[in-house]
Amino acid sequence: MTDTWLIVGLGNPGAQYQGNRHNVGQMVLDELAGRVGAGFKSHKARAQVVEGRLGIGGPRVVLAKPMTYMNVSGGPVSALANFYGISPDHVVAVHDEIDIPFNTVKLKIGGGEGGHNGLRDISKALATKDYLRVRVGVGRPPGRMDTADYVLRDFGTAELKELPFLLDEAADAVELLLQEGLTAAQQKFHPAKTAG
């Protein structure tokens, strides 16, 4: 296996979805591609990819945006992992997370998918849940709004003002995760709980 990392930004293809909360993972990958200094190119695994290094002397990465609908992201992720010889412990899924507040980034390895069908499909395709996740908080829907309707809507006006900072923070989390490991990244991006 290789020391290359596969960083996958989850979302739906097509212009009509680009500003949706559900596509925040792909937005983070656009930020990372800027840091790598390369543009996305089509790959036979039904994905747009960027290959390069994150930072000078940084880790080798394949940034990937599956060009399938989110619920069937596993096929492209598995195909890319096989193509590049990347094991599941070097796969990072960047995705929207309704169970944490907007403007929050959290990291974990394995565990449940929390009803996220994109993660469920990746777990099935990789035959393991033991891959890294960078969870980008989009918050819960207001009132009785359906969760699917909420994540398939664009960010609100107030959120759009904060979104560049959130994308930058999530990209920083990916970089720290790759350079210093999960524990260091969690210590930085998970606020300490205060007593009381």
UniProtKB/Swiss-Prot annotation:
Protein name: Peptidyl-tRNA hydrolase
Naturally occurring in which organism (per UniProt): Pseudarthrobacter chlorophenolicus (strain ATCC 700700 / DSM 12829 / CIP 107037 / JCM 12360 / KCTC 9906 / NCIMB 13794 / A6)
Complexes and interactors: Monomer.
PANTHER family: PEPTIDYL-TRNA HYDROLASE
Superkingdom classification of source: Bacteria
Binding site for tRNA: Y17, Y69, N71, N117
A biological process from GO: rescue of stalled ribosome
Gene (UniProt): pth
Enzyme kind, highest EC tier: hydrolase
